Amino acid sequence: MKYDAGRIDVAVIGAGHAGIEAGLASARLGCKTEVFTINLDWVGNMPCNPSIGGTSKGHLVREIDALGGEMGLAADANTLQMRMLNLGKGPAVHSPRAQIDRRAYSAYMKRTLEEQENLTLRQAEIVDIYYDSGEWVLTTRLEAVYRAKCVVLATGTFLGGRVYIGDVSYESGPDGMFPATELSKSLKALGLPLRRFKTGTPARVNRRSVETEKLEPQFGDEDIVPFSFTGRYEVKNTRECYVTYTGEETKKVILSNLHRSPLYSGKIDGVGPRYCPSIEDKIVRFSEKERHQIFIEPCGAETQEMYLQGLSSSLPEDVQLEFLHTIPGLEHCEVMRTAYAIEYDCIDPLALKRSLEFNDFDGLFGAGQFNGSSGYEEAAAQGLIAGINAARKVQKKSALELDRASSYIGTLIDDLVTKGCSDPYRMMTSRSEYRLLLRQDNADRRLTPIGYELGLISQERYDAFCRKLELIEDEKRRAENTTIHACKELNDILVSRETSPIDGGIRLSELLRRPQADYKLLAPFDPTRPDYPKEVFEQVEIDIKYEGYIKRQQAQVDEMRRLEVKKIPQDIDYAALGGLRLEAVEKLSKIRPENVGQASRISGVSPADISVLLIHLERENRKHDK
């Protein structure tokens, strides 16, 4: 028998990476929040790679931290190995990545949710949802009925989940958990635009059966940069990763058994991730390649499980064993968990606003893989924004909408709600037009003032941030006013780095503009240098060295924002606008962009269509001014 379980401000369905950030943000902003999960023991689970960060994903984690989210802190507290990727390239693409103790990370996040004021964490499966009299009504499997002002759907791969391993398939969530089958039916009945996507995960092997002496070890960085700008946790490297490669025998085994793959036999209907293909997909698509790189990574400090990055598969279990045993170092490996593919329901993100609220469902928000994205970091970023905006809607405040020039978070959301996605969306640095401005090292300078204004950044943390800004400006002035004097030692170093020697004296800032010079190189010749934190000098050096490029990108941002401020009425009838092409009418009517800048980024909307739209808006503005 159904019973009334009470009223809440914000209900979050799912306690994965999106649900955690949504629940914490909502509660920290003062809303009575309830987070529902199918299993309390799997809060913040990592069903695939036990890592946080990576190229562009590390940018997202630092942005989450800069806004006041939790992922960066949780990762720092549970890191096994930390590396900064792409150090051989420019600072725009430097990206932190950490190997994580997945069980410890989960326990950290569960404890954080349990201890958060205004938040209740509950093990319960939501099986029905509908809108009634200005509230969302949620019913659990045990017939408890909750009423919520706003709901965040953060269902991950649980929604209608089905696992595939060769000829075997069955209803399941990730890691053998129950799927959310009834909720999927309820959302379809509600009218949400659901579709099927697919993802997969590799096998896990017992470390004791891996011949590590045959593998190439990979160590963490000596100079560690944590995810969190707070520096709350001391991050240490305690485990190694390893590298190996597939070979010709691996390829033969997979190709001879391709007919047994559900991916190639037509059993899987869902669309898989373009940038994270299975090993059988890689063998077929890149047939000319002789080998594929495999990373063997620890899953935790208290387990022998090792994760095989690059070997995602849905081939039968016996075939998996056969091809694993062809790989150097894995010839005698024991599989602890079999690789699988999982198909699940998600939405078309074109149904969402930039606030991540549905266009047609008041107070209903989506986040994470439910929105068609892939990855823990993409999920957490969306969860943070959805949680913030659900809370702000309850409090009758305007939504937080980050634009493309503010953050990778803004780029991610804009891509999803403006362009949509035909396969699981993955963040990449190449997706941003402004990546020199959106570096991982300056995420706090871009976003911490916003987090403070929202109420997610403490006064103590904000004061420390403001002090950092003061030091950056002080050092810039010093660099402009400090003269570095010529000497044989300095000129020998400059010549060895293939840059011209100096005569007499030169300003420190002028030397720093040279690609071959940096603060570390110039330390012996800069006796007045103050004892500031290294991140202060890092920011000053980048600002000086890339000043011209930064100014050019900022001019592009100013032009983009000129169009972003031109709002489009949501009740506009595009079909009534003379001059718009039919494709533009269809796309604009479906997506309903909130401003001209967003409209200009829609595939199928031309510059000529934007001109027609601008003329119409200007005409309407003149009418209102009279």
What annotation goes with each model-predicted range?
Residues 4-18:
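Beta1/beta-strand and adjacent pyrophosphate-binding region of the FAD-binding site
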Residues 6, 24-131, 142, 154-174, ...:
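Conserved N-terminal/central alpha/beta ligand/cofactor-binding core
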Residues 39, 57, 185-321, 418-491, ...:
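An anion/pyrophosphate-binding glycine-rich loop and adjacent beta-alpha core
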Residues 141-150:
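Core beta-strand elements of the Rossmann-like FAD/NAD(P) dinucleotide-binding domain
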Residues 150, 155-159, 315, 328:
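Glycine-/small-residue-rich beta->alpha transition segments that form the dinucleotide
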Residues 307-373, 401-414, 533-587, 592:
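A glycine-rich dinucleotide-binding beta-alpha-beta segment and adjacent secondary-structure elements
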Residues 379-400:
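Internal hydrophobic alpha-helix adjacent to the cofactor/substrate pocket in enzyme cavities
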Residues 431, 437, 448-453, 457-611, ...:
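Extended, charge-enriched "interface" segments that sit outside catalytic cores
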